[in-house]
Every structure is written in C-alpha cells, then in structure tokens.
C-alpha cells in the first residue's frame, strides 16, 4: 500500500487517475469545515484545523484522498506529517487497510491535542486565581478572545469526531458487504 504526500498543484497535475479530482481540489480551496465525501472507488476529506499558535488567525488546512491501495495527504501546513511520523508502524500496513490507517491518523490528531488542552486548563486556573484577587480592567476583552478561541477548538473537535464516525460507519458497511 502506498502512502504519499503531495501539494495541491502536484495532485492536480498528476497523471494518475483520481475520480472526482476537481471536486476534491475545489473542496480544498473552499474549505469551510471538516468533511469527508465517499464515492464508489474511495473517499476524500478536508480538515480545517485551528492554528494553536494563533487561535484568532487563519485555519490550517489538510486533506486526504483514499482509494484502493493508496492514501494521499495534501498537507502543506504540515499537520498530518508529524502524526504519521510518530506512527511509523502504519507505513507497513497491507493493502485493504486504507480506512484503518486514516482513522489512526485522525485519532492521532486528537491524541496530540490532549497535552495542549491540559495547558489551556492550567491557564484557566491561573486566570481564576488572578480574578479572585483583582479582575483586570480589560477582563471582558480577554474573556471574549478566550471564549472565541475555545469555540474554534470546540467546533474543530466536533467536526473531526463527526468525520471519524462517518468513516467508521462506512468502514462497517464495506466490511459487511
């Protein structure tokens, strides 16, 4: 089985046959949320991920295209590559396990979030301690920015879990065929 990384341009100019190639690229360019699309020969999906270095800024975009014997990641923002690097055992999986590999990568994205969320929890505790003593004058603005950042993260986690559930459901259907 082949796992590869491409840029959007490399994917578009690839000589290989990829059903729904143009729809995939259009979905990537207009990414509004995390989603996955299934078709008879495979599936593709888009991940719109909040940038933890700047939660108020632009989203990071990654995508995957899966067909029998092949997974292609479009990952110019370098979101998927580190997850796959940590899971080197996934590179030796046989053909027919494409969706299992994809699920492992998506679950890896969630696992990598746990330490980050623990740091946020610590910051919240620090803020609570400060607020008990003396609330700062700009507290409403700070709270609003923080709430917006948490809303972005929450939206991503909900969408990612929806994508994972959809893939698991589709995997179950394919196994029962």
Feature map (PLM): residue ranges:
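Residue-level signal for short amphipathic helical patches enriched in basic/charged
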Residues: 108, 112, 134, 170
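Helix-boundary and N-terminal cytosolic regulatory elements
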Residues: 1-93, 123, 159-175
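Long, hydrophobic alpha-helical segments that serve as membrane-spanning/inserting helices
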Residues: 129, 133-139
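Long, non-coiled-coil amphipathic alpha-helical linker/lever segments
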Residues: 93-109, 113, 175-177
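A generic short alpha-helical patch detector that favors 3-5-residue windows
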Residues: 75, 93-97, 116-119, 156
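Amphipathic alpha-helical coiled-coil segments
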Residues: 106-120, 124-127, 143-146, 150-153, ...
């Amino acid at each position: 089985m082949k796992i590869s990384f491409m840029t959007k341009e490399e994917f578009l100019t690839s000589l290989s046959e990829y059903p729904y190639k143009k729809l995939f690229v259009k979905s990537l360019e207009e990414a509004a949320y995390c989603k996955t699309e299934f078709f008879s020969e495979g599936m593709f999906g888009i991940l719109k991920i909040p940038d933890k270095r700047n939660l108020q800024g632009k989203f990071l975009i990654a995508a995957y295209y899966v067909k029998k014997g092949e997974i292609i990641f479009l990952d110019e923002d370098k979101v998927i590559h580190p997850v796959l690097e940590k899971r080197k055992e996934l590179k030796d999986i046989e053909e027919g396990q494409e969706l299992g590999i994809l699920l492992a990568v998506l679950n890896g994205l969630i696992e990598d979030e746990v330490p980050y969320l623990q740091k946020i929890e610590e910051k919240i505790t620090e803020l609570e301690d400060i607020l008990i003593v003396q609330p700062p004058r700009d507290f409403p603005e700070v709270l609003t920015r923080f709430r917006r950042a948490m809303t972005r993260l929450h939206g991503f986690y909900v969408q990612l879990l929806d994508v994972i559930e959809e893939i698991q459901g589709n995997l179950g259907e394919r196994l029962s065929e």
